[in-house]
Every structure is written in C-alpha cells, then in structure tokens.
Amino acid sequence: MNYFQLFNIEVSFDVDLQQLSSSYQTLQKTVHPDKFAHASEQEQRIAVQKSAQINDAYQTLKNPLQRAEYILVQRSVEMPNEQHSFQDTSFLMRQMELREMLEDVRHSGDVDAALLEVQSVLSTEYLQLSQVMRTQISENNAASNSAACDNLRKLKFYQKLNIEVDRLEDSLFDD
C-alpha cells in the first residue's frame, strides 16, 4: 500500500496537512471497527487491520522526517541505521560544537539567554537543512536521493538535540 495513493495526494515532501487530515478522517469513517460491530469476526479483524494501516500511514505522512524517510524508502534508497557513522567530518565537528554549546548553558551566567541562543541556532540550522533536503527530494535522482538520505540523518540529530534542549530547560527551571 502506497501511503500517498491511500490519501490521494501527490508524492511530495510538502504535504497539505489539512487535506491529509480530511482524507484520513474520511477513510477512518469507512473502516472504523465500530461500523463492523455486528459483522463477522473476520470482517471485524480486517476492519481493525485497515484502520491500523490508515493510522500508520497518517502518522508517517504528517511528520516531515518520517515522510521524507518514507519517500526515500519508496524510491529504494538504502537507509543506513542510526549507528552508522557519518562520513561528513564537518558535520561531526558541528555535532560536537552544538553539544558543547548545550553543555555550556548549565554554566552560563544568563541561562535564559544561553538557552535562547541554542534554540535559535538549532532552529535556524534545522530549517536551512530541511530546505536543502526538500529540494533534493524534489529532484529525485540517485545523487539527490542519496544526499537527502544523509541530510535526513542530520535532521534527526537536530531533532534529538532539540529534545535534549527541552529536557535541559525543564531540569533547570523545575528547581
């Protein structure tokens, strides 16, 4: 099952989330298990399976990074696992710099300003890299798909680092 076809939307990194949501609700109404309460056990099981598939498809397409990964997998791009090391040494250095920047927040004289700075840097870099990946996905050739795969992994790093920033913020201001 192709998720984009399921929701009758064009294969693209940019998705109209309102259209996606509307299609999702329409599909769920047709297969919702409650509609099959008086059906046979097999029909109920099929309804539950279809509903779960629609939920999975919706969750994948509404999340930009999951959507990008789905598109790349559909294009048979080999997705390295999370443990696979980056070949991009400049990005490895940037990872270390960002982690140091995050660690420095704890020891800053102005924690609020330091946190805002980290959040601003992460947001800016995430948006820039996301735009690059968006272009690469739209180009849809072997080189651009491979580059998009690398950038997707980088964006996942930024996403995880943002979670760490949120946790740090919670720990600093919960006291």
UniProtKB/Swiss-Prot annotation:
Pfam family, one: HSCB_C
Key words, A-Z: Chaperone
Signal peptide: none
Any one GO BP annotation for this protein: [2Fe-2S] cluster assembly
InterPro entries assigned to the protein according to its UniProt record, in alphabetical order: DnaJ_domain, HscB, HscB_C_sf, HscB_oligo_C, J_dom_sf
A GO cellular-component term linked to this record: iron-sulfur cluster transfer complex
GO molecular function: ATPase activator activity; protein-folding chaperone binding
Domain of life: Bacteria
Domain J: 2-74
Record-linked SMART domains: DnaJ
Quaternary structure and interacting proteins, as annotated: Interacts with HscA and stimulates its ATPase activity.
Family the UniProt entry places it in: Belongs to the HscB family.
Purpose of the protein: Co-chaperone involved in the maturation of iron-sulfur cluster-containing proteins. Seems to help targeting proteins to be folded toward HscA.
NCBIfam families tied to this protein: hscB, PRK05014.1
HAMAP family named among the record's database cross-references: HscB (MF_00682)
Classification via PANTHER family: IRON-SULFUR CLUSTER CO-CHAPERONE PROTEIN HSCB
Protein's recorded name: Co-chaperone protein HscB homolog
Organism of derivation: Colwellia psychrerythraea (strain 34H / ATCC BAA-681)
Encoding gene (name): hscB
